[in-house]
Amino acid sequence: MSSAKKIGLFACTGVVAGNMMGSGIALLPANLASIGGIAIWGWIISIIGAMSLAYVYARLATKNPQQGGPIAYAGEISPAFGFQTGVLYYHANWIGNLAIGITAVSYLSTFFPVLNDPVPAGIACIAIVWVFTFVNMLGGTWVSRLTTIGLVLVLIPVVMTAIVGWHWFDAATYAANWNTADTTDGHAIIKSILLCLWAFVGVESAAVSTGMVKNPKRTVPLATMLGTGLAGIVYIAATQVLSGMYPSSVMAASGAPFAISASTILGNWAAPLVSAFTAFACLTSLGSWMMLVGQAGVRAANDGNFPKVYGEVDSNGIPKKGLLLAAVKMTALMILITLMNSAGGKASDLFGELTGIAVLLTMLPYFYSCVDLIRFEGVNIRNFVSLICSVLGCVFCFIALMGASSFELAGTFIVSLIILMFYARKMHERQSHSMDNHTASNAH
């Protein structure tokens, strides 16, 4: 690409912010309402952590580019960590897809109020998963083409609320909503971090291609941090203004928080329009992400990390069996979480459970990438910024883990250890195969 066509820092920052912002924010205000305006500190900590992680990945992309991103970086520390990261990453993605599905269902509750209840919401989400599984099996590449349109549509009410919503902001309402978590301020902040981080999951892929940027070694890391920070500021403004516009009980009970703010700002006609836009955005995003999960399974199978069935593709390159297996797992988890919440709660409770699990599963891959940058660049003054961002990224992973419930944390830890057991089995099979080949060659 000629130098004249390459983009500079300002444009690059805009691209990163656009890549970062999406449907992840759409249902967060309902979950954060149960914590309160104090979640602003959770946002600030999350932004610092996300910017640090963004720098780590941008630095690794420019200094040590590897096919496979976090999986490759973890593998540079230890092949066992690479295997573990590949499995964790795959499962985090399909679990995250369920959260996107629940967001779509929640915004559809504007038209079908029964979808605010966990059981109907769970059933609807499972139905959506299977519909898009079959769409992708038939070759639904057209779905991904609609994703960009959907993301623009979902961001309109978010940005509008962040900018215009302050006209309806009430300081007394905000003060009453400061800490609604029935716990100490410190615990409320830590609890909010796990939720806030959901909006930044995907930070590892936000960096733009170095080939389209002027002076990429300087511009890409800086733009990635600035773009992540810009997205975070929009998130803070949008969620904090809602804390001053409505009582926490209204937001917590809402299945479509930005539809409510749009109706206040523009009139009642806007709520169904925003709900339809957001549901459309989430559905197109889900369709696109489901195919990406299927392709991730193919890569893992080709690397020898997953059973061969995941790597089987048809004449069109579609991993039908992998898509079906992912849909079965998504259905099983959705049934389990729906049953756990069936005694009471809302669709947003399902969202909170799913995002918590998905975020926790990404913490080890993020941590390994930070450690790999320290390994690659060393501990010295010359690479001071890289060292600080790597350490901050590691600390942020620890803080996010602290915000998890004991059940979520224990589950993540157990799954991580079970993966290493499978790795040991894989190594045994590889060694046995190698010894058999060696014996056969000696016999000849």
Swiss-Prot record:
Stretches assigned to the Periplasmic side: 28-34, 116-122, 170-192, 243-272, 344-353
Effect of C397S: Moderate decrease in both cadaverine excretion and cadaverine uptake
Topology within the bilayer: Multi-pass membrane protein
Its job: Under acidic conditions, in the presence of lysine, functions as a cadaverine:lysine antiporter that facilitates the excretion of cadaverine and the uptake of lysine. At neutral pH, also catalyzes the uptake of cadaverine via a proton symport mechanism, however the physiological relevance of this uptake activity is probably negligible because the expression of cadB is low at neutral pH. Cadaverine uptake activity is low at acidic pH.
CC annotations in GO: plasma membrane
Result after altering W41L: Moderate decrease in cadaverine uptake
InterPro entries cross-referenced by the UniProt entry: AA/rel_permease1, Amino_acid_antiprt, APC_superfamily
Location(s), subcellular: Cell inner membrane
The entry's keywords: Amino-acid transport, Antiport, Cell inner membrane, Cell membrane, Membrane, Symport, Transmembrane, Transmembrane helix, Transport
Transmembrane segments: 7-27, 35-55, 95-115, 123-143, 149-169, 193-213, 222-242, 273-293, 323-343, 354-374, 384-404, 405-425
Result, substituting Y55L: Moderate decrease in both cadaverine excretion and cadaverine uptake
Cytoplasmic side: 1-6, 56-94, 144-148, 214-221, 294-322, 375-383, 426-444
Activity regulation annotation text: Uptake of cadaverine at neutral pH is greatly inhibited by carbonyl cyanide m-chlorophenylhydrazone (CCCP), which dissipates the proton motive force, valinomycin, which dissipates the membrane potential, and nigericin, which dissipates the transmembrane pH gradient. Cadaverine uptake at neutral pH is also inhibited by putrescine and lysine. Cadaverine-lysine antiporter activity is not inhibited by CCCP.
Effect of mutating D303N: Strong decrease in both cadaverine excretion and cadaverine uptake. 24-fold increase in Km for cadaverine for cadaverine uptake and 9-fold increase in Km for cadaverine for cadaverine excretion
Catalysed reaction equations from the record: cadaverine(in) + L-lysine(out) = cadaverine(out) + L-lysine(in); cadaverine(in) + H(+)(in) = cadaverine(out) + H(+)(out)
Keyword Transmembrane part of the UniProt annotation: yes
Outcome recorded upon mutating Y423L: Strong decrease in both cadaverine excretion and cadaverine uptake
Family from the record: Belongs to the amino acid-polyamine-organocation (APC) superfamily. Basic amino acid/polyamine antiporter (APA) (TC 2.A.3.2) family.
Domain of life per record: Bacteria
Result for mutant: Y235L: Strong decrease in both cadaverine excretion and cadaverine uptake. 23-fold increase in Km for cadaverine for cadaverine uptake and 7-fold increase in Km for cadaverine for cadaverine excretion
Disrupted-gene phenotype: Mutant shows reduced amount of cadaverine in the medium.
Induction entry: Part of the cadB-cadA operon, which is under the control of the Pcad promoter. Expression is regulated by CadC. Highly expressed at acidic pH in the presence of lysine. The global regulator Lrp also has a positive effect on the expression of the cadBA operon when cells are exposed to moderate acidic stress in the presence of lysine. Repressed by H-NS under non-inducing conditions. Repressed at pH 5.6 by OmpR.
Name of this protein: Cadaverine/lysine antiporter
Taxonomic source organism: Escherichia coli (strain K12)
